[in-house]
Every structure is written in structure tokens, then in C-alpha cells.
């Protein structure tokens, strides 16, 4: 836990920097907004992704808000969430290798886990390990709907793999998943964006329909990221949405996906040098703030000509000379991309009304296996 625990209740200006902050009021409004769209309006399940959240305390907040479970990117993350009491977990990735598969099968005794597959080699390894352990593992087939990354091709290939899973005594075919966001990043025209999402998700739901026509039970049809969820959630055939990063909001989602959530995640820094009237140097660089796919955005300064991040410094050049902020003043940055920022820190500091209210350990940090 952070050494700043003694600062709870104090103004954030007294915190040592750099420090990762979440505005709790903005966070709670983002959560309520996503819950309303996904659960309230669309009537589907919400399984927020924790690849960017990384924090079990946040996961429990989302479960309390109505989420049915969580999505994890890696087995390590799933183990962290299960150890923290999260019970319904989808690992939206392929788990390969005998030691990892053995860990996965052991995890089934602690949580209701499902894992993605996109090939027969994975199916055979999972089935063998589950049977040897006397377990039964839920499996979802990942379908390539837009990303051209992992995923079996839609329709007939997806049905064939689903049948293979269903025929394994150590496995239970649970459904299908896909990610449509890769095909819509940067699309500005809302009609074009909707069409691209409908096409991608249609590949997933069509595959699910064909599985059912083949006599398979399909409980899960999972998709939807922060950049698409308000459209994907309302498309026929979708059963659950994986969007998670929207609870924080950031410059990337706003600029590249048109997500107008509040930017709740910020990095508080200290101005450590003013070498010229137009240059501001702060004590946080790319070891504290992600620089891709978007740079962080400084708050409360004049027009910025440029921003550069080195390992431990942020250097701003202003368009016009300005004596403020001065050395020792605090300067806050909106996270450029929350998924690439949270894992840089050990703790997340929840603030309300300018004061530190809570500190949450980012227990998923470094969990990449």
C-alpha cells in the first residue's frame, strides 16, 4: 500500500508526485452511464474488461453496480481477480503451454472461469488437462470479426470448432466472443461507424445462430469495447458487453472513438523547472504517463505548442510566455490512454472534492502471463 495512506482526508496538493488519481465523482458517473446503457437500456450482461483497470477494488465496484463478472486478458489477471473474490471470469485470450494450462485448471476450483480458444490444438490441451484433473472447463470460441488478430473465421469454421469443443468431456462449450473495435477506430462519420460495428458484430451473431442450428447451446455472445458498447449492446443476438475502460475515460477514447465520458483518470505532477518563460518541466515522464496511442493532456495551463515525454520528465512549450505555473506548483494531466497508464503505478488514489478519499492497490500490475 502507498506510503501516502496517512494523507487520506488531506488535499491532493499535499501528495508526493507523480501520483495516479481517479476523480471518484466522475468515475461513478461513468459507471452509472455504462450500466444504464448496457443493463438498463439494452438489457444485456456487463462483463467489464480488467486489462486496463487492473484493480480488484474497482472490479468489485463494478460488480456492485450490476456487472455479472469480469473479463481478463491474461491468466495472471484472472488469478488476481479470483483471489480477491471475483467469481465469474472470462479470460478473453488463448492460454497455451502446459504450466499455464495446469494453472488454469486449478483456477476452476476457485472461480467460475471461461477461456477463449481459436484452434484445435488449444482445445485438445485444455480437454486433456481438465480430464486429468477431474474438472470441466467452460470454453468460448473466439471469432475474428474485425481485428484480424486471433480468432477463428466466422460461420462454418466457428461452428466446426464449437462442435469440437462440445465433443470434449473435459470442456463445456459456453458460446462465442469477438472484438469489433479494431474496425472502427478513427471513424468520424456516425453512420459509417454504426455500419462497421453492425457488420462486425453480425459476423459474431451469425456464427452463434449457425451454432444453434447445428444443435449447440450458445449461452454467451460476448463483444463490445468502450469505443463501441452503446451500439453493440443493442444489436440483436448479443448477450454481454466487455467494455471496461470507459469507467475511467481518457483522451484516446474521446478523440479516436468519439466517447464523451468524463476523463476521471489523471496524473498529478509537480513543476520542477521553468528554464524559460515558455517552458514547463514536470516530474513525470513515460514511466508514469503513457505516450501512445495519445499523449496525456495538461490541465490549467495556457496554449501548449508542444509536449514531450522522456523517462522521468514532461516538457511543455507554451505558445506565449507565462509565469504560471511556478516551480513547486502542481500540474495535472488527463491520461492519454488509461489502459496504458494504470499498470505503470502501484496504487490508484481516489479523490473527491480535491481531497484524498481512498487508496486502492493495483494488484494486477505486472500480471502479463
Give a label for each model feature.
Residues 49-185:
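Active-site-proximal beta-alpha core segment in soluble small-molecule metabolic enzymes
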Residues 3-22:
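Generic N-terminal amphipathic, Lys/Arg-enriched alpha-helix
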Residues 2-7, 26-58, 71-73:
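N-terminal glycine-rich anion-binding loops that anchor highly charged ligand groups
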Residues 195, 227-302:
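Active-site loop ensemble at the mouth of alpha/beta enzyme cores that anchors a bound cofactor
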Residues 27, 51, 81, 141, ...:
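Conserved, mostly hydrophobic/aromatic
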Residues 138, 145-257:
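Active-site loop/helix belt of alpha/beta enzymes
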Residues 275-369:
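C-terminal accessory subdomain/extension
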Amino acid at each position: 500500500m502507498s506510503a501516502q495512506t496517512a494523507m487520506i482526508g488531506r488535499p491532493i496538493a499535499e501528495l508526493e508526485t507523480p501520483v495516479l488519481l481517479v476523480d471518484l465523482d466522475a468515475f461513478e458517473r461513468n459507471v452509472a452511464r455504462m450500466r444504464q446503457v448496457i443493463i438498463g437500456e439494452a438489457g444485456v450482461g456487463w462483463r467489464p474488461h480488467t486489462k486496463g483497470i487492473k484493480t480488484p477494488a474497482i472490479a468489485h465496484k463494478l460488480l456492485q453496480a450490476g456487472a455479472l463478472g469480469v473479463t481478463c486478458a491474461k491468466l495472471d489477471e484472472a488469478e488476481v481477480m479470483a483471489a480477491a473474490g471475483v467469481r465469474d471470469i472470462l479470460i478473453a485470450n488463448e492460454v497455451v503451454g502446459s504450466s499455464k494450462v495446469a494453472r488454469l485448471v486449478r483456477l476452476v476450483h476457485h472461480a467460475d472461469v471461461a477461456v477463449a480458444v481459436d484452434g484445435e490444438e488449444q482445445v485438445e490441451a485444455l480437454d486433456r488437462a481438465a480430464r486429468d484433473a477431474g474438472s470441466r472447463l467452460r470454453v468460448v470460441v473466439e471469432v475474428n470479426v474485425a481485428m484480424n488478430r486471433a480468432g477463428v473465421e466466422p460461420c462454418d469454421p466457428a461452428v466446426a470448432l464449437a462442435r469440437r469443443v462440445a465433443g470434449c468431456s473435459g470442456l463445456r462449450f459456453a458460446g462465442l466472443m469477438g472484438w469489433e473495435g479494431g474496425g472502427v477506430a478513427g471513424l468520424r462519420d456516425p453512420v459509417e461507424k454504426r455500419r462497421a460495428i453492425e457488420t462486425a458484430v453480425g459476423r459474431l451473431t451469425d456464427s452463434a445462430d449457425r451454432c444453434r442450428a447445428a444443435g449447440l447451446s450458445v449461452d454467451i455472445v460476448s463483444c463490445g469495447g468502450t469505443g463501441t458498447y452503446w451500439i453493440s449492446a443493442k444489436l440483436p443476438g448479443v448477450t454481454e458487453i466487455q467494455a471496461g475502460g470507459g469507467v475511467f475515460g481518457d483522451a484516446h477514447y474521446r478523440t479516436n472513438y468519439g466517447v464523451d465520458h468524463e476523463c476521471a483518470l489523471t496524473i498529478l505532477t509537480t513543476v520542477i523547472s521553468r528554464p524559460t518563460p515558455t517552458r514547463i518541466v514536470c516530474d513525470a515522464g513515460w514511466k508514469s504517463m503513457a505516450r501512445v496511442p495519445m499523449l496525456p493532456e495538461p490541465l490549467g495551463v495556457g496554449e501548449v505548442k508542444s509536449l514531450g515525454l522522456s523517462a522521468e520528465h514532461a516538457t511543455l512549450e507554451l505558445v506565449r510566455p507565462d509565469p504560471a505555473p511556478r516551480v513547486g506548483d502542481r500540474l495535472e494531466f488527463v491520461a492519454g490512454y488509461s489502459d496504458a497508464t494504470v499498470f505503470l503505478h502501484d496504487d490508484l488514489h481516489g479523490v473527491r472534492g480535491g481531497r484524498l478519499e481512498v487508496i486502492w492497490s493495483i494488484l494486477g500490475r505486472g500480471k502479463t502471463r
